[in-house]
Amino acid sequence: MKTTRIMGMLLLSAAFLFSSCAKKQDDGKVAFLDREVDVKSFLTGFPYSTWGFYLSDDATKLYYLRNDEPSPLVMLDLTKSTDISQGDVISSDDWSKKNFWSPSWNEKDGFLYWMGDQRNDEKIDLYRMDPKTGETTCFTDVPYIYGWSFNDAKDKAFYVARIDQVGDDHVDEFHILDLKTQEDKTVCTDRPDFRMTWTEIASSPDDSGCLLTVLKNVNRTFTNIAYLDYATGEYKVITDPSVEASLDGCAVISPWYSQDVAYFLSDHTGYANVYSFNRATGEVRPVTAYRQDLRAKWLEADGKKYLATVRTSPEGSDVAVLDPDGNEIVCERYPATLTLKTTVGNKMYFTAGATDILFQMWVVEFVDGQLKQSVLVDLPENIKSSMVTSHAQKLSIPTFDIDPATGETRMLHAYLMVPEKPLPADQARLMVMSFYGGDNAYDMEHQIFTAAGMYVLSASPRGSSGFGRDFAALNDHDLGGNETIDMIYCARYVSEMLGIPPERVGCFGMSHGGYETMRLMTFPGEVNGFKTSFPFGFGVAVAGFCDIIWEHYHSNIPDWDYLEAGDPVTEKDKLMDRSPISHVDKISGPLLLIHGDHDDRVDIGGSQMLYDALKKEGKPVEFLIMKGQGHGYKGIDNQMLYYRTILDFIARN
């Protein structure tokens, strides 16, 4: 599908769209209906990604990319400053042209390690760099690395790599890399019944084995924990493989508690909880039984080990300290979404965010059985106030079916972002996020839309995370089914609540959300025997796919398509009916397609096919290519083009 003809057409589309934006490219302001939106002030006011901050294990260094042109890699020494604008550039390469994932500073050898690629194409390898010289070493040459970690001494790295893939089948290998000699040893190749795909690794203190996650028959809904013996290369599954557990709800906790005892997380009871494993006896024991997903790391205070835990929900985050048996010593709720980054002694380090909090770093100290919270890293008040242009209104929206837990109509959580300065009533717009919504987190795209005076609906349809394993699994094998009905109900509810007619309601989303946008715009009116409709006025589909079966065979993560949609062979008819390419004649309004030409996760052909089909039908469609970009768009120039194109499209529709 990636032919010269197609790329030429896409580049022409991009050139046309870019030329229409060129006059105001420098000042960064975009004319939108009754106002100008200073998009560039958002991009320069906070030239980072809210999720792209990486804290070293010892909490002394913060690594992040800055969205300049070019986009450098920056390190902030937290022992000297807590102002992220004062970070030192440690690599002046243009990191907008490559991926930088899971970095970790090794204080033992002074190198920074990460997994990434060289051209945003997700050929993921393991790298390290000397921050003093910028010299970089690539240790591997494989199609994909799923996960990696250090040992306790930090003189070895463990990683699982995809070695070969033919169609849906692939082979993964577990490797041990000696960081001093650079000797790379293959420990084992995985088994067809339990693949090491998307693994996490926690090595034992004596480096004789590890806990890792494995997928039964490459099925993300049957994620298990296994113990791997390095000497024999054999691994034994220690959780019940007959019980469902999700990939997102299972994890290993590093370091181990002791020489023979390790802790891990599993949501096989419905929520991610803590369990312990004794490799000497083989015993697995439940430690916690919360009805809320949990994350945990070890904490030390007064010479004892404790579990530092955090549970998040739209209402906030519960931080609790537990003893090794799971007894809760103290718990505090904080009105933000907290991500536990590391622990040092009795201190927990979190990144914090909310719909109105861009980025903070917190320290929560466990002292005398109590928690003491303070903000370590924050932004200046003038930046914070200028970057928030709306307030969040929490909604509970009824959908079409009955929740078996309550016996009543299922209610969906959502946030409505209400602009400080809305458009006049006769110009009012509502933007509906098609998927991945409902988080209590800052979203720059939402704030740019509300700066333009538009309302933004961020809802959590079935399949969303944050509400337990079972809710997240409700859309498994039902892509484009009941999740789509949920979003139609949400859009109609808020459209009527605000008095904004459907022709001024648009949907937008990326990846799964890009597909869902295409699906909502071309919805045939019935799925799973249920009839409903909502005539969206326009849509913005980013990195989406229009043909589920084609996507399955052209993605570097085909197991995702299999889980979400179904078997492309035995369920072909269903998958084709759920594919927007099958219903182009029913599109309800103009559609803007945006895609990176280096995207290996969702191939650009998925947008090209829909563009061609809509053009053939005489339907209004536009196509922007993000040159040199993968599954996400980096760099200020790329982001200016992205937002300018979207705002111009919405204003014209």
Segments from the language model and where they lie:
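C-terminal motif of bacterial Sec signal peptides marking the signal peptidase cleavage site
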Residues: F18-S20
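Bacterial signal peptide processing site
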Residues: A22-K24
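A short helix->beta-strand "capping" segment at the edge of beta-propeller domains
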Residues: D27-Y48, G87
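Conserved beta-propeller blade repeats
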Residues: P47-L65, D94-L112, V142-I163, T189-K216, ...
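Beta-propeller domains
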Residues: Y64-D93
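Short, solvent-exposed loop/turn segments at conserved positions within beta-propeller repeat blades
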Residues: D68-S71, R119-I124, Q165-D172, N217-T223, ...
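Short loop/turn segments that connect beta-strands within beta-propeller blades
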Residues: L78-S81, D130-G134, D178-Q182, D229-G233, ...
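Serine-hydrolase catalytic core recognition
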Residues: T337-N653
